[in-house]
């Protein structure tokens, strides 16, 4: 049979060039001169199959396996040998029909690589495949002159190895070794498990005590938590109720303040005006009295002078002289005419003054009506703004209550790394607000945090408190900074309707810019929908485009548009609240100003009416005096015409008399005017005095009311602060101490408490004291004891399994020993049956037998050989000659081969010590065995070469480099002859 199909070597020892030997016969001889490298085939085969002893490979180090170099050939960097076996009969422990084994070593590394059919493997895998085929170290598969001598000289225990390989019990030996090692490991594991088990028992006992204590602690702690949270929630709700009451009271008082403070200011302003006007009127009275005194003095002087003139005129009239009477009448007419002209001038002046006052009254009345209208409109606007503010506050409070992000922000003391919702950090250009809000969508309410760790803690808080879901924007961990591609931006900048990128129209802190870029960096702003469609098309519909009106063209081409109710957004809610408050402040200021203007106009209107009334009275008096003077003039003219029978010619009177009358008329008019003004001024003072008294009373009442309200407000605010502090402390305790939100605590711990507040506090103190007295608590022991018990059960199960495994392994060892003993003994018996035939053939007679050195222990017994060549009876093989020793060894070895055929046997000059006749017998035995065994024979002997099916020659045509080639018997004999001559 042919088992080894192919031998390939490169760089191994003297095989500098790659050589390949294909084996086609079952008996192949390798011949060549000494030093030609023919035995390197044996070394190569040993090396591939895992030989590690450099001595057995005839080398000192791994680098000696690699071609060292010669004069004509450089040293090789590596050595590799590959053996290909026919495994069609499944002789190897591998199902593949052909097995190729290769070993490679690199110069300087000292490490080998092993391959099976081109796949990198371990030496152990190769050893496993080639077990029990006789090619292992010390086995029968490789027989050299040295191994023949070794067989004879070896100790019985060492000699046993050949018989074990032949019997095939090596697999049992290895199996037993594995099982024994496994048993040893199992026993060791059992000891270790026993130690662990004992430790676990101690730990369990200790943990049981700790866990019992911990469970009592946890139960008491939970009861304390239940009671304390119930008390805290009750106090919170009670305090919240009181806080609401105080807030309502404060709101009511502040509302009254808003109403009464402007009224007080108005009253104080009016009082100041009244006082000032009263002082002005008082000063005016003094001035008028002084002026009136001077006028009276002037009138007295003028009347005295007129009286003198009148006496003179009357004296003339009383005279009988008609001429003098006529002259007197002329003078009287002239005087009265002068007085009439003066009175008529006064009438015209007064009429003009009345006209001016009437016009001014009309103007003031119009201004007053306008002011009233503005005041009404302002009041209506103020009411609307106040209602709008209440609505916005309600919206804000609703958002605060329902938004999980705000709940997190409220609990910043319990959580770190939270900042605020995104809307609080952004500012938009007004014209882009609608577009940007549309682009941001719900992300405007996302919660900004420092990093992922803060987000994870917040999410855990949300889960624990069952609050809801929040989307987080971690500043440090936003990894993407989206932008529009430069080539697309270049296109956009050339198109009409392109208003920029969303992120360009947002103001924010620099640290938040990556977030803004991530959300708006790829959002295009367009002027209108038509432009948006165009921009989307020119950028291949890769980006979202938003118009100033909020229409959207999404990436991919989806369009969204139409009427949308202008709802409040999270972004502008706070802005609108601030705007509403500013509007209310402005409207309140406007209302105060309008009321002040209204009071001033009403006062002015009253003054104008009084002046008008005064002027009308004065006009009436002037008209009466004009009528009286006209009648007097008419009477004088009639009398004059009766005396003269001619009409009055109107010749003017003397300058002095006329001027005197005019001065007197003016003085009387001034007196009357001053008297009227003085009377009006007195009436004004009386009116102002009443107004001042009334205003002072109202001011005092209102000031007293405000003082009372201030006191109430101080008390209410103190109460508010007190309950706010209580609520704050309770919230901090629940947030920080229990890691719960107030909402969750109210939902789960708002339970009736059967104890009074004092009793509950005392019970809490007692429970806390009990907890403190319990000392250190191992809370982990509760979970640990379950784990520890499980581990104990597992280890105990493992302990029992190991005990069972030990029994099973011991049983397996017994079974292995039994099988090995049986098969080994069968081999010994078969060899002893075959040995006499082989021995007689080689020796031509005599006897030979193998025996156990210890028949009671077949598996450990050595093997002794007893041989008696013809005519000799020896007790020790060492007494035989060298040739006899060789024949004895070969007799036993060939007998073994007949009984247990090996697939491959390598004979390395094993017959060198035999004479020609025995060489021939040696060769015949090999030839008879070649049907079941492939022989690779390295030989110098002609008798052996003649029996070989094929001869291969090994020669060094180039110094240091071995070449192999087929060779004839004649050529082989020439090699031998040359070798002998040398």
Curated annotation (Swiss-Prot):
Function: Required for chromosome condensation and partitioning.
Pfam entry (one): SMC_hinge
InterPro entries: P-loop_NTPase (IPR027417), RecF/RecN/SMC_N (IPR003395), SMC (IPR024704), SMC_hinge (IPR010935), SMC_hinge_sf (IPR036277), SMC_prok (IPR011890)
Molecular function as annotated in GO: ATP binding; ATP hydrolysis activity; DNA binding
Domain SMC hinge: 416-535
UniProt feature coiled coil, ranges: 171-235, 263-377, 568-627, 669-713, 753-818
Cell location: Cytoplasm
A biological process from GO: sister chromatid cohesion
UniProt similarity note: Belongs to the SMC family.
Main localization category: cytoplasm
Entry remark concerning the domains of this protein: Contains large globular domains required for ATP hydrolysis at each terminus and a third globular domain forming a flexible SMC hinge near the middle of the molecule. These domains are separated by coiled-coil structures.
Source organism: Mycoplasma pneumoniae (strain ATCC 29342 / M129 / Subtype 1) (Mycoplasmoides pneumoniae)
Gene3D superfamilies to which the protein is assigned, alphabetical: 1.20.1060.20, 3.30.70.1620, P-loop containing nucleotide triphosphate hydrolases
Entry's Gene Ontology cellular component terms: chromosome; cytoplasm
Keywords: ATP-binding, Coiled coil, Cytoplasm, DNA-binding, Nucleotide-binding
Subunit structure as annotated in this protein's UniProt entry: Homodimer.
Protein known as: Chromosome partition protein Smc
Positions contributing to ATP binding: 33-40
Taxonomic lineage from the root: Bacteria, Bacillati, Mycoplasmatota, Mycoplasmoidales, Mycoplasmoidaceae
């Amino acid at each position: 049979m042919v088992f080894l199909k192919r031998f390939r070597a490169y760089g191994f020892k003297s095989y500098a060039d790659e050589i390949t030997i294909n084996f086609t016969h079952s008996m192949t001889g390798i011949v060549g001169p000494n030093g030609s490298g023919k035995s390197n085939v044996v070394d190569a085969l040993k090396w591939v199959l895992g030989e590690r002893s450099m001595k057995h490979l005839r080398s000192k180090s791994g680098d000696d396996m690699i071609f060292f170099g010669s004069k004509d050939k450089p040293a090789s960097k590596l050595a590799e040998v590959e053996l290909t076996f026919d495994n069609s009969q499944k002789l190897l422990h591998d199902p593949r029909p052909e097995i190729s084994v290769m070993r490679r070593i690199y110069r300087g590394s000292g490490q080998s690589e092993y391959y099976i059919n081109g796949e990198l493997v371990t030496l152990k895998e190769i050893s496993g495949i080639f077990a029990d085929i006789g090619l292992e170290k010390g086995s029968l598969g490789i027989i050299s002159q040295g191994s023949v001598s070794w067989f004879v000289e070896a100790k019985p225990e060492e000699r046993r190895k050949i018989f074990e390989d032949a019997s095939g019990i090596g697999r049992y030996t290895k199996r037993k070794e594995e099982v024994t090692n496994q048993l040893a490991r199992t026993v060791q594991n059992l000891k270790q498990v026993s130690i662990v088990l004992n430790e676990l028992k101690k730990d369990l006992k200790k943990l049981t005590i700790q866990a019992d204590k911990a469970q009592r602690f946890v139960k008491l702690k939970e009861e304390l938590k239940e009671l304390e949270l119930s008390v805290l929630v009750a106090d919170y709700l009670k305090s919240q109720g009181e806080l609401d009451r105080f807030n309502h009271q404060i709101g009511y008082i502040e509302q009254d303040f808003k109403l009464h403070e402007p009224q007080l200011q108005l009253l104080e302003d009016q009082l100041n005006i009244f006082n000032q006007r009263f002082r002005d009127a008082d000063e005016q009275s003094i001035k008028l009295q002084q002026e009136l005194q001077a006028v009276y003095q002037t009138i007295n002087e003028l009347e005295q002078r007129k009286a003198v003139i009148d006496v003179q005129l009357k004296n003339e009239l009383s005279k009988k002289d008609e001429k003098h009477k006529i002259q007197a009448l002329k003078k009287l007419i002239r005087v009265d005419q002068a007085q009439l002209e003066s009175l008529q001038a006064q009438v015209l002046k007064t009429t003009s003054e009345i006209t001016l006052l009437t016009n001014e009254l009309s103007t003031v009345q119009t201004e007053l009506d306008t002011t009233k209208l503005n005041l009404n409109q302002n009041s209506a606007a103020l009411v609307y703004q106040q209602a709008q503010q209440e609505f916005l506050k309600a919206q804000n409070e609703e958002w605060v209550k329902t938004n999980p992000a705000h709940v997190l922000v409220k609990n910043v003391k319990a959580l770190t790394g939270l900042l605020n919702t995104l809307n609080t950090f952004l500012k938009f250009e007004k014209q882009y607000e609608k577009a940007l809000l549309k682009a941001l969508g719900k992300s405007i309410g996302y919660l900004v945090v420092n990093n992922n760790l803060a987000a994870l803690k917040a999410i855990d808080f949300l889960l624990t408190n069952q609050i809801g879901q929040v989307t987080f924007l971690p500043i440090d961990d936003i990894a993407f900074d989206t932008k529009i591609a430069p080539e697309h931006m270049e296109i956009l900048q050339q198109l009409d309707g392109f208003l920029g990128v969303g992120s360009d129209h947002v103001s924010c802190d620099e640290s938040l810019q990556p977030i803004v870029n991530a959300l708006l960096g790829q959002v295009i702003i367009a002027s209108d929908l038509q432009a948006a469609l165009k921009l989307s098309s020119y950028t291949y519909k890769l980006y979202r485009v938003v118009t100033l009106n909020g229409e959207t063209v999404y990436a991919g081409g989806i369009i969204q548009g139409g009427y949308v109710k202008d709802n409040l957004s999270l972004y502008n809610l706070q802005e609108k609240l601030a705007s509403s408050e500013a509007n209310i402040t402005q409207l309140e200021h406007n209302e105060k100003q309008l009321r002040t203007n209204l009071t001033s106009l009403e006062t002015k209107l009253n003054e104008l009416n009084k002046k008008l009334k005064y002027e009308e009275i004065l006009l009436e008096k002037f008209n009466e005096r004009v009528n009286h003077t006209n009648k007097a003039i008419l009477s004088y003219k009639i009398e004059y015409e009766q005396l003269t029978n001619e009409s009055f010619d109107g010749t003017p009177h003397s300058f002095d008399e006329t001027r005197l009358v005019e001065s007197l008329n003016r003085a009387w008019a001034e007196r009357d005017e001053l008297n009227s003004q003085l009377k009006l001024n007195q009436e004004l003072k009386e009116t102002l005095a009443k107004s001042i008294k009334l205003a002072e009373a109202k001011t005092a009442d209102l000031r007293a009311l405000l003082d009372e309200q201030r006191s109430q407000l101080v008390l209410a605010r103190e109460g508010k602060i007190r309950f706010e502090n209580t609520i704050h402390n309770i919230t901090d305790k629940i947030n920080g101490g229990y890691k719960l939100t107030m909402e969750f605590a109210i939902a789960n711990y708002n339970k009736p408490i059967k104890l009074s507040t004092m009793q509950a506090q005392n019970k809490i103190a007692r429970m806390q004291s009990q907890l403190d007295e319990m000392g250190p608590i191992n809370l982990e022991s509760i979970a640990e004891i379950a784990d520890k018990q499980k581990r104990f059960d597992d280890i105990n199960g493992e302990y029992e399994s190991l005990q069972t495994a030990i029994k099973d392994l011991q049983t397996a060892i017994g079974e292995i020993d039994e099988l090995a003993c049986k098969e080994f003994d069968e081999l010994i018996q078969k060899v002893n049956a075959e040995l006499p035939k082989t021995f007689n053939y080689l020796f031509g007679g005599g006897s030979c037998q193998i025996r156990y050195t210890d028949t009671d222990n077949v598996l450990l017994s050595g093997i002794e050989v007893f041989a008696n060549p013809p005519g000799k009876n020896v007790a020790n093989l060492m007494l035989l000659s060298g040739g006899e020793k060789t024949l004895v060894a070969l007799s036993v070895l060939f007998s073994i081969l007949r009984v247990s055929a090996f697939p491959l046997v390598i004979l390395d000059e094993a017959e060198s010590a035999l004479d020609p006749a025995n060489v021939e017998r040696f060769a015949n035995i090999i030839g008879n065995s070649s049907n079941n065994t492939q022989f690779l024979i390295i030989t110098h002997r002609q008798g052996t070469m003649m029996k070989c099916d094929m001869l291969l020659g090994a020669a060094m045509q180039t110094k240091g480099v071995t070449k192999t080639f087929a060779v004839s018997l004649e050529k082989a004999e020439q090699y031998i002859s040359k070798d002998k001559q040398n």
